[in-house]
């Protein structure tokens, strides 16, 4: 029977589809398991990154079904976004057509891989049946006070013609087109995420996310406990309110810095000699994102605004500056500058020759050290100039200052957040229309729920070089009637950020066919109880998507739509799939694979290769479709899952996938052998079945903890090796073979389901594995440990004999014809047994070991005393950097020694097999002292470590 993956895979994919085996509904009698991967943007063909992500998810979904779980495993498409719009411009088409063509392509790829999705629940965010509920939820949030339209400085990308959220600006450049981003004031729609800032932060302690993801979210939310302090402007009624987390440094303030966009700046410099310099700075800051101004600035610039502010606790007048490192959206947009205790302020003060004053000391009772840098740690207050402050430290110092400010009405303790409200609106076509209408009489009016969805028009023309939002000029879309007063009005032409679409899709999947509501509460609460049980996706979504999804879940809970507080119970961030690409070390740049045989086009140096993430831009991609055609989907899945643990990066290798294909053929051969086995008896029955029970327990443990690589190692490599070993050792009976296969084939199913189904059917099973529940509790038989330990002992002896032969052959002119094995003397076995028992009883060998040894009869024999002491040391202490054997022997070894295992009898019984395995004529076995001490091996023989010599 030949292994024919194409035929097998087509057969079972059709069978699964016809039987609708992966469709799932609420079933309170079963434990549920909701498995979900971050759904793809349908750019066309599936790539290896997709294959890895979905192979992980599919394996876990199939594993949980085998274990009796009611599994929800859906698929959809994150199908709104600029790429489809840009593609439509290139071909003069419509984003809708581009998107649906791509969806059909990737759907075919997914089905060819055999992924076990409930296809009834398939959704696309660009389908009006989905984005209708985007709009409905938006109106619900509006009713809850979570939606706000206001003018605000925004990140504007000119080439894309749209606003970007802070999270979408990378190094002051658009995450999509990489062009420079500018700050611009516009009327925009916001979701008030800050309402949930505390809950979003505090709940991180209770969810199973990778620690680096939690750290990124904590940093992004950025809760700061501090105080707002009022600095009156000299000669004016205006006051600068500055937020600080270090009120203990207030006596060191030597200047105040405003964000260039702070509204007070204009009034302070207008018509003065400082206006031109200020406007130059403000224009420069407008070309930078807030993120870069906070985190990436190297050159801190400022402009004196010609005015002074008064320190509320000292009365000192300090100059007011505008600085590029202060942003309006954090705190109050104003900073009290303390150069003695903040390095950023220190650098600024040095540059502009502003006084530096130290008011904290590292050492109690001493003056501050002069180090040429700011001391930013906590310290003892000094030089305050006021009573009751000097000598205070840390939190006591902070609280004393806050109390003084509040008592004098000059400040108030408060909490600030780095997290900002979600700027949602985009000036693009291919997104969810924001369901509002602009009426001259009524203002901004929500679209009535019964009029949803507000649909995107299909008659928009897209052309190369087109800019702006086509909705704004589409009269059929824009012109409408006000639902309140009935006069002519205009629709909102902004669309929603596409991250909105993916912020609740996991809830829609729980009830995807519902046309009356976004989802039914009963369905959502069942499938989302505790959150999505396993969510798989890239680390790049740690802040944006994952944070938005957490916000949505909490807001929808408060809207009464569900009882869930967190969307995801466990998050796995899968590693990248990498492949070799040309690399120039001098330029530190990766180049397209077409340049592999050329010098670097920039510097002319010879190129080397290094591993890089597969990407179209580098040309180092591998087509899953071609690999499936050549090797089959099961082989591709095996390569992906065995290549690395889910969280680790992995390298593509042609030789590795070819090796995995050979392994699949070896598995097929072994399975066929087992099915066709009709032997009445077998020497290895007990061992093979004991081994299968042990392997099944280990496999279940690994798979349950998403240890897919180690799980696949057991199911696809060790189980084959065990079968082959059993055949070499004397074979197994038909009954044992059948039992082994019924244990083994389901273990193959999660990773390589097609071959597993085929062999399960060939075995005579009438129920598909897709509909089968197996017992995951594989209880060992009483003698399993001893049986396995004996066989492992035999393997070790053979391996050691091979190693000794290599050494012996170097010192022998002729051919080696026999191997002599001397097992340990009886007294060594007895003493080892006692040492194991004492260790299990927590005996203190350091205190009482020698005293015990002196009571033993072997110790009192002068001829053996020295050898006994040496052996005892090896067993309980160790030597030559090796720990004592009682610390290195495992459960199997301990059980074997304590069982009274007769090494001589066992090895003698298996001498024939050893002779065959070692390709040697004679194998002699005896206990040390009962025969010739060949090569002096008797003294070095230990329990389970016989002395071995060749001659």
PLM regions with names:
Residues 8, 13, 193-223, 259-303, ...:
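Amphipathic alpha-helical
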Residues 307-330, 478-648:
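Alpha-helical recognition segments enriched in aromatics with Gly/Pro capping
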Residues 1-48, 188, 200-201, 211-224, ...:
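Non-catalytic terminal extensions that flank enzyme cores
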Residues 658, 767-951:
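C-terminal low-complexity, glycine/proline- and small-hydrophobic-enriched intrinsically disordered tails
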Residues 78, 436-440, 447, 453-454, ...:
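Acidic, turn-prone loop/beta-hairpin segments
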Residues 57, 70, 262-363, 368-369, ...:
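Catalytic alpha/beta core of large soluble enzyme barrels
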Residues 25-93, 122-137, 244-245, 312-348, ...:
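N-terminal catalytic cores of NTP/NDP-binding nucleotidyl/phosphoryl-transfer enzymes
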Residues 2, 11, 15-19, 90-248, ...:
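Residue patterns forming the tRNA-binding/recognition surfaces of aminoacyl-tRNA synthetases
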């Amino acid at each position: 029977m030949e292994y024919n993956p194409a035929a097998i895979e087509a057969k079972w994919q059709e069978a699964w589809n016809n039987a609708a085996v992966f469709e799932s509904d609420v079933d309170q009698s079963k434990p549920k398991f909701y498995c979900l991967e971050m759904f793809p943007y349908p750019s066309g063909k599936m790539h290896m990154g997709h294959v890895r992500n979905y192979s992980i998810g599919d394996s876990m979904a199939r594993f949980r079904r085998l274990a009796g779980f009611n599994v929800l495993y859906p698929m959809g498409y994150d199908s709104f976004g600029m790429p489809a719009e840009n593609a439509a411009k290139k071909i003069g088409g419509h984003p809708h057509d581009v998107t649906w063509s791509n969806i059909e392509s990737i759907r075919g790829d997914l089905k060819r891989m055999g992924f076990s999705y409930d296809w009834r629940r398939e959704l696309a965010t660009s389908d009006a049946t989905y984005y209708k509920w985007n709009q409905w939820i938006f109106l619900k949030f509006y009713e809850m006070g979570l939606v706000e339209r206001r003018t605000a400085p925004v990140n504007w990308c000119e080439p894309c013609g749209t606003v970007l959220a802070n999270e979408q600006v990378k190094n002051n450049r658009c995450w999509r087109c990489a062009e420079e981003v500018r700050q611009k004031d516009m009327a925009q729609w916001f979701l008030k995420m800050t309402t949930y800032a505390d809950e979003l932060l505090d709940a991180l302690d209770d969810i199973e996310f990778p620690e680096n993801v939690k750290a990124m979210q904590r940093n992004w939310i950025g809760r700061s406990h501090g105080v707002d302090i009022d600095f009156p402007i000299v000669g004016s009624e205006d006051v600068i309110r500055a937020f600080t987390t270090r009120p203990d440094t207030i006596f060191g303030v030597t200047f105040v810095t405003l964000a260039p966009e702070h509204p007070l700046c204009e009034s302070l410099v207008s018509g003065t000699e400082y206006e031109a310099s200020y406007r130059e700075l403000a224009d420069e800051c407008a070309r930078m994102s807030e993120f870069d101004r906070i985190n990436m600035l190297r050159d801190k610039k400022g402009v004196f605004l010609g005015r002074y502010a008064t320190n509320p606790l000292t009365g000192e007048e300090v100059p007011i500056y505008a600085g590029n490192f202060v942003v309006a959206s954090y705190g109050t947009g104003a900073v009290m500058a303390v150069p003695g205790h903040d390095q950023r302020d220190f650098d600024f003060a040095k540059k502009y020759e502003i006084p530096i004053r130290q008011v904290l000391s590292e050492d109690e009772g001493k003056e501050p050290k002069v180090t040429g840098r700011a001391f930013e740690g906590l310290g003892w207050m000094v030089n305050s100039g006021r009573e009751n402050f000097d000598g205070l430290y840390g939190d006591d110092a902070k609280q004393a200052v806050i109390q003084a400010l509040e008592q004098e009405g000059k400040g108030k303790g408060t909490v600030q957040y780095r997290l900002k409200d979600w700027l949602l609106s985009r000036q693009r076509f291919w997104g969810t229309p924001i369901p509002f209408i602009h009426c001259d009489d009524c203002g901004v009016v929500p679209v009535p729920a019964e009029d949803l969805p507000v649909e995107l028009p299909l008659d928009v023309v897209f052309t190369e070089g087109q800019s702006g939002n086509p909705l704004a000029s589409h009269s059929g879309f824009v012109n409408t009637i006000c639902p309140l007063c009935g006069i002519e009005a205009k629709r909102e032409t902004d669309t929603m950020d596409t991250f909105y679409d993916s912020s609740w899709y996991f809830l829609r999947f729980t009830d995807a066919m519902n046309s009356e509501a976004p989802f039914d509460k009963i369905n959502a609460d069942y499938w989302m109880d505790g959150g999505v049980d396993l969510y798989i996706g890239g680390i790049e979504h740690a802040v944006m998507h994952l944070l938005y999804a957490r916000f949505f879940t909490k807001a929808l809970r408060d809207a009464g739509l569900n009882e869930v507080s967190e969307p995801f119970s466990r998050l796995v961030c899968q590693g990248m799939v990498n492949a070799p690409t040309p690399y120039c070390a001098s330029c530190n740049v990766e180049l397209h694979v077409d340049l592999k045989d050329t010098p670097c086009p920039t510097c002319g140096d010879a190129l080397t290769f290094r591993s890089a993430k597969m990407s179209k831009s580098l040309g180092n991609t591998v087509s899953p479709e071609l690999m499936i055609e050549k090797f089959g989907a099961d082989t591709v899945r095996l390569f992906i899952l065995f290549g690395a643990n889910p969280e680790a990066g992995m390298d593509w290798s042609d030789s590795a996938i070819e090796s995995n294909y050979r392994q699949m053929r070896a598995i097929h051969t072994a399975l066929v052998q087992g099915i066709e086995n009709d032997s009445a008896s077998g020497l290895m029955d007990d061992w093979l079945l004991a081994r299968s029970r042990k392997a099944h327990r280990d496999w279940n443990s690994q798979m349950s903890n998403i240890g897919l690589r180690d799980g696949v190692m057991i199911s696809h490599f060790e189980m084959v090796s065990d079968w082959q070993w059993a055949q070499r050792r004397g074979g197994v009976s038909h009954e044992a073979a059948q039992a082994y296969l019924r244990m083994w084939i389901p273990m193959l199913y999660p990773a390589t389901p097609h071959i597993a189904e085929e062999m399960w059917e060939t075995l005579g099973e009438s129920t598909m594995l897709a509909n089968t529940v197996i017992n995951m509790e594989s209880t060992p038989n009483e003698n399993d440990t001893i049986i396995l330990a004996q066989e492992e002992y035999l393997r070790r002896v053979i391996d050691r004999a091979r190693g000794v032969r290599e050494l012996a052959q170097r010192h022998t002119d002729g051919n080696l014809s026999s191997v002599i094995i001397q097992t340990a003397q009886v007294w060594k076995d007895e003493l080892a047994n006692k040492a194991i028992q004492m260790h299990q009883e927590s005996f203190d060998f350091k205190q009482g070991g020698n005293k015990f040894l002196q009571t033993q009869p072997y110790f009192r024999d002068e001829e053996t005393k020295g050898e006994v002491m040496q052996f005892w040391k090896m067993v309980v202490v160790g030597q030559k950097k090796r720990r004592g054997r009682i610390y290195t022997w495992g459960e199997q070894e301990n059980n074997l020694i304590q069982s009274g295992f007769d090494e001589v009898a066992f090895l003698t019984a298996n001498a024939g097999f050893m002779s065959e395995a070692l390709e040697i004529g004679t194998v002699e076995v005896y206990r040390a002292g009962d025969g010739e001490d060949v090569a002096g091996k008797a003294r070095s023989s230990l329990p389970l470590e016989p002395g071995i010599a060749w001659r």
